[in-house]
Regions:
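Short, surface-exposed tryptophan/glycine-enriched loops
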Residues: 121-145
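Extracellular repetitive beta-rich solenoid segments
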Residues: 1-28, 65, 73, 94, ...
Length: 178
């Protein structure tokens, strides 16, 4: 073979041949986005996560205006999100529970991650930090769209909860045809 070719099997009892390597394309629908600034979350209310900065979006299918991703190509997709949440106000700021949702076409598709932390003995004024992360494989058509929502409940409604910019991300890519 020559540079750029791979040895390909032609089946049992048939000699293999060298063919031009395939796969790997810059046109495969994919994106990765993150928060552009810390995002305050209302206590005990589902909140859409505003992923306003994109690392990349092949085909321009991620909207930093609507904070949603539309694949644009039918197929099976790996979809993943990670949220890093911080609270303050000591015991009152400790997470009672939290959930991260994947919405498809404006409705909840699944709970990607659930959080039920334990009382970690924080004192007043200390910060609690928790991570929600999850992934799913879903079949999408060309016009489906996906969004991430988060629900966080602290012990009292007075505690503030913010999503951190550094590790809070939303990403997806095509893994195969429908």
């Amino acid at each position: 073979g020559t540079s750029g070719q791979v040895l390909t099997s032609n089946g049992v009892g048939v000699a293999p041949t060298f063919q031009t390597a395939g796969g790997g394309s810059d046109s495969v629908p994919a994106f990765r986005a993150k928060l552009s600034a810390s995002l305050s979350i209302s206590d005990a209310a589902a909140t859409k996560v505003a992923f306003a900065t994109q690392y990349f979006s092949t085909g321009g299918t991620y909207s930093t205006t609507n904070y949603r991703w539309t694949p644009g190509t039918a197929g099976k997709y790996y979809i993943e999100a990670t949220l890093i949440a911080n609270t303050s106000d000591g015991y009152n700021g400790i997470f009672a529970n939290g959930e991260m949702y994947l919405y498809k076409n404006g409705s909840e598709l699944t709970i990607l991650s659930k959080l039920k932390p334990y009382d970690n003995g924080l004192n007043e004024g200390q910060t609690d930090q928790e991570t929600l992360t999850g992934a799913i494989i879903d079949i999408a058509n060309t016009t489906d769209y996906y969004e991430i929502y988060v629900y966080i409940d602290t012990h009292t409604s007075t505690a503030g909860t913010d999503l951190e910019t550094g590790g809070t991300t939303f990403q997806a890519f095509l893994i195969g045809g429908a």
